[in-house]
């Protein structure tokens, strides 16, 4: 009598979890469109927004200037605005671990934590400028190991074109040949810098920023000269 061996059942692929980090100072329509397009394209049930507390490239504490000399908005205000911006979309959630984490916040640390929590199919959403800067981040090659990199096209870049590979020096050289996946989305030339400048100059930002966020900015006198 022979015993027939059966192959073990294949392990199910974990559901993708999309991540969108940033200072969100303030959150705007571009963030929301980017997140929704990425969620649908990669089949993610949820996009977690990761507001930065003390980013590597920027100070995250009130009173300390960022690299461009501007005073960053307090994390409590940025978190409150983000909650208002995401309200009403059950597929959007906030993960505030980088605000709660003491000291500088690094993307690779967040990805490692999420993997340890069982989220092994991660989609990291980046802008094209962030991708170009990625080789200067902490352990860039490890970031590519932990997550699929989904890149938002620049407003003038056709969505059909292939995004560039990350390049750099040192450890960043190791990510030079790695490819990324581009997010198919409409071109939107909106940035938090633009929103802050318009508010500071008394220009309208309606339809660029959710109404609830506009009300919060006005109530708390944010971005005024």
Task: Say what each PLM segment does.
Residues 1-164, 168, 172-225:
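Nucleotidyltransferase catalytic core that binds NTPs
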């Amino acid at each position: 009598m022979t015993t027939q061996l059966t192959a073990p059942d294949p392990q199910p692929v974990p559901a993708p979890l999309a991540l969108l980090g940033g200072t969100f100072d303030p959150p705007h329509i571009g963030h929301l469109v980017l997140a929704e397009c990425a969620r649908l394209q990669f089949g993610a049930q949820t996009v977690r927004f990761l507001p930065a507390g003390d980013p590597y490239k920027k100070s995250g504490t009130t009173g300390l200037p960022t690299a461009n000399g501007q005073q960053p908005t307090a994390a409590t205000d940025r978190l409150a605005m983000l909650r208002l911006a995401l309200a009403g979309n059950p597929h959007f959630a906030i993960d505030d671990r980088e605000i709660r984490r003491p000291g500088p916040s690094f993307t690779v640390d967040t990805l490692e934590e999420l993997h340890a929590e069982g989220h092994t199919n991660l989609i990291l959403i980046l802008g094209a400028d962030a991708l170009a800067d990625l080789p200067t981040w902490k352990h860039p090659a490890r970031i590519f190991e932990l997550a699929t990199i989904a890149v938002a096209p620049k407003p003038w870049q056709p969505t059909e074109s292939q995004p560039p590979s990350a390049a750099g020096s040192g450890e960043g050289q190791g990510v030079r040949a790695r490819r990324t996946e581009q997010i198919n989305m409409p071109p939107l030339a909106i940035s938090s810098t633009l929103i802050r400048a318009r508010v500071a100059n008394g220009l309208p930002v309606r339809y660029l920023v959710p109404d609830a966020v506009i009300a919060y900015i006005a109530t708390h006198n944010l971005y005024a000269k």
